[in-house]
């Protein structure tokens, strides 16, 4: 979660927020989990993969189907739930989580991130889903395939990536190393004939403008496809059990099948690679308390698609990996069909040259990368800012309606060489967020720190400003929620961020998959600027459509 709320909504006079006419109303019937799907939701038999007729065809998000006339009413305000009921909800959730696998490693245990099954605790969760407007839910789902296609097209424009990041390269060593690998692939004309994207586009709903605005588009290590599904099921279970007390309809929580849709895309890419003996390798961190989210995906691949997965760190891949003459990547004696990154997105993942050697080795191979180096760069903050400039989307997309739908989601984004914006940010820092080229929580700069950072960069005058962008600060509605972490629940004033997953796969002749693929809802205390769950700022949540 990248943009916090510390004051009532404030509009930016420097931002043009154009409204576009809505498209035709969307057709009927969302797919919801039925009661019969409750026991083993992640490992149900796969349905046929949806193959769109056109790469840019938007997913149609249908109307809700419920049996209750009053089902569109907002869920009860958690602030009004008495303490006895809160305790019942918490106790039932504490039993449900270990039974269903809604778990993370205990941050107080040294072994919890390295040894599976040891020192587990429930994932941090909200006990009641967050109300969310159905119209904005549909909007976010509808643009997911367009963003998928945009990432693919941007990734194929090496000149655009290199030029857009040229100043950033000089100011940010991490981006420079990524661009170095990208340049080497361009020099040898390395073509990715099979391209796989597992993305997540994160949004906040601005309270004053009522616009759904994009925080960022993640193209590497889009986390929580496994646990997010379980939170939706937990909330449906609790609302069903306490339906009379809470007076809500569990069917207003939309189906969330992200983990199986991720598995479908990975399995289809594995199949396209064409070697039934090859494996999918998960590139992971040496210590990973969120390993169970990853293991849910491995389980879905094994149970639904009979695909074997292995887990290796970048250092292990350097030590055990080799590239055969035909481009086959072999790690620890096993041929690799697909490389799925759950690490490698931050400088802290590269402890030495060993990790960089592993990244280059994988990029040189003919294995399908998720993401490739070009997909990784296409998701950088600087590229997000470049795409928000006038007439840049037109370089990659032809359909005017698609372009309008994406622009409607864009918040204000600026480089630090725009002097008028920098001046305004120094005068009114509360209206901006300063973002470095980093993934994961805890990196952004807020409030008075924005002014201090900008003045420092101006004084230094070394070009270090190219390592950052400025973004409009979004001020979402403050809502009440009940948050539970480490067995302790408490009511809080909170804000939320919606992430929409997308899956994209194409070979050299056609797009095989391009669709919205579930969601992630994260909720945090409204006074907190940052919002990553794994970083300890937020909890997992689900949405209740109103």
UniProtKB/Swiss-Prot annotation:
Listed binding positions for ATP are 216, 381, 435-444, 446, 471-474, 497, 524, 530
Q: Which domain of life, per UniProt?
A: Eukaryota
User: Does Transit peptide count among this protein's keywords?
Assistant: yes
The residues listed in the UniProt record as binding Mg(2+), with positions renumbered to this chain, are 216, 218, 439
EC primary class: ligase
Q: Which GO terms describe its molecular function?
A: ATP binding; glutathione binding; glutathione synthase activity; magnesium ion binding; protein homodimerization activity
What pathway is this protein a component of?
Answer: Sulfur metabolism; glutathione biosynthesis; glutathione from L-cysteine and L-glutamate: step 2/2
Q: Which SUPFAM superfamilies match?
A: Glutathione synthetase ATP-binding domain-like, PreATP-grasp domain
Its keywords, alphabetically, are:
ATP-binding, Chloroplast, Glutathione biosynthesis, Ligase, Magnesium, Metal-binding, Nucleotide-binding, Plastid, Transit peptide
Instruction: Give each disulfide bond as a residue pair.
Output: none
The prosthetic group or cofactor this protein requires is: Mg(2+)
Per UniProt, the transit peptide runs over 1-63
What Pfam families does UniProt report for this protein, alphabetically? GSH_synth_ATP, GSH_synthase
Listed under catalytic activity are: gamma-L-glutamyl-L-cysteine + glycine + ATP = glutathione + ADP + phosphate + H(+)
The EC designation for this entry is 6.3.2.3
GO terms for CC? chloroplast; cytosol
Q: Where does substrate bind?
A: 200, 220-223, 288-290, 294, 342-345, 522, 533-534
Q: Where is this gene product found?
A: Plastid, Chloroplast
Its predominant location is: plastid
**Cofactor notes:** Binds 1 Mg(2+) ion per subunit.
Checking PANTHER family in the record gives: GLUTATHIONE SYNTHETASE
- Subunit structure, per the record? Homodimer.
Which family, according to the similarity comment?
A: Belongs to the eukaryotic GSH synthase family.
Q: What is this protein called?
A: Glutathione synthetase, chloroplastic
Q: Which organism is it from?
A: Solanum lycopersicum
């Amino acid at each position: 979660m990248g943009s916090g709320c510390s004051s009532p909504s404030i509009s930016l006079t420097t931002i043009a927020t154009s409204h576009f006419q809505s498209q035709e109303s969307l057709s009927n019937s969302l797919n919801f989990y039925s009661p019969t799907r409750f026991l083993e939701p992640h490992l149900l038999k796969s349905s046929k993969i949806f193959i769109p007729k056109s790469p840019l065809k938007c997913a149609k998000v249908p109307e809700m189907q419920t049996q209750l006339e009053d089902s569109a009413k907002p869920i009860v305000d958690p602030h009004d739930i008495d303490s006895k009921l809160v305790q019942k909800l918490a106790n039932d959730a504490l039993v449900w989580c270990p039974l269903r696998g809604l778990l993370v490693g205990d941050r107080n245990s040294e072994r919890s991130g390295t040894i599976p099954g040891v020192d587990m605790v429930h994932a941090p969760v909200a006990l009641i889903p967050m109300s969310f407007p159905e119209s904005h839910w549909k909007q976010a789902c509808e643009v997911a395939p367009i963003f998928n296609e945009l990432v693919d097209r941007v990734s194929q424009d090496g000149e655009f990536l290199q030029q857009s990041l040229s100043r950033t390269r000089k100011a940010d060593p991490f981006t420079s190393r990524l661009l170095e690998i990208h340049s080497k692939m361009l020099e040898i004309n390395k073509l990715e004939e099979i391209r796989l994207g597992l993305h997540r586009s994160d949004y906040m709903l601005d309270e004053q403008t009522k616009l759904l605005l994009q925080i960022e588009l993640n193209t590497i290590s889009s986390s929580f496809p496994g646990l997010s599904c379980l939170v939706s099921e937990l909330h449906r279970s609790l609302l069903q059990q306490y339906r009379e007390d809470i007076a809500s309809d569990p069917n207003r929580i939309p189906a969330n099948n992200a983990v199986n849709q991720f598995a479908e895309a990975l399995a289809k890419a594995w199949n396209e690679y064409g070697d039934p003996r090859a494996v999918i390798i998960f590139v992971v961190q040496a210590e990973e308390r969120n390993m169970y989210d990853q293991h849910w995906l491995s389980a879905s691949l094994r149970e639904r698609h009979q695909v074997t997965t292995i887990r290796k760190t970048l250092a292990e891949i350097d030590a055990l990996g080799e590239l055969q003459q035909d481009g086959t990547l072999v790690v620890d004696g096993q041929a690799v069909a697909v490389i799925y990154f759950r690490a490698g997105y931050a400088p802290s993942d590269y402890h030495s040259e060993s990790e960089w050697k592993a990244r280059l080795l994988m990029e040189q191979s003919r294995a399908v990368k998720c993401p490739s180096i070009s997909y990784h760069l296409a998701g950088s903050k600087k590229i997000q800012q470049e795409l928000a400039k006038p007439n840049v989307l037109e370089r990659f997309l032809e359909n005017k309606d698609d372009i309008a739908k994406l622009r409607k989601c864009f918040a204000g984004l600026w480089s630090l060489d725009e002097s008028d914006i920098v001046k305004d940010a120094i005068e009114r820092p509360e209206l901006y967020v300063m973002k470095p080229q980093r993934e994961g929580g805890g990196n952004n700069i807020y409030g008075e720190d924005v002014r201090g950072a900008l003045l420092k960069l101006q004084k230094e005058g070394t070009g270090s400003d190219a390592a950052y962008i400025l973004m409009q600060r979004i001020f979402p509605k403050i809502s009440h929620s009940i948050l539970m972490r480490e067995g302790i629940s408490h009511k809080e004033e909170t804000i939320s961020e919606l992430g929409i997953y997308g899956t994209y796969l194409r070979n050299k002749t056609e797009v095989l998959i391009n669709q919205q693929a579930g969601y992630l809802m994260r909720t945090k205390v409204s006074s907190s600027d940052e919002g990553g769950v794994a970083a300890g700022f937020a909890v997992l949540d689900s949405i209740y459509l109103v």
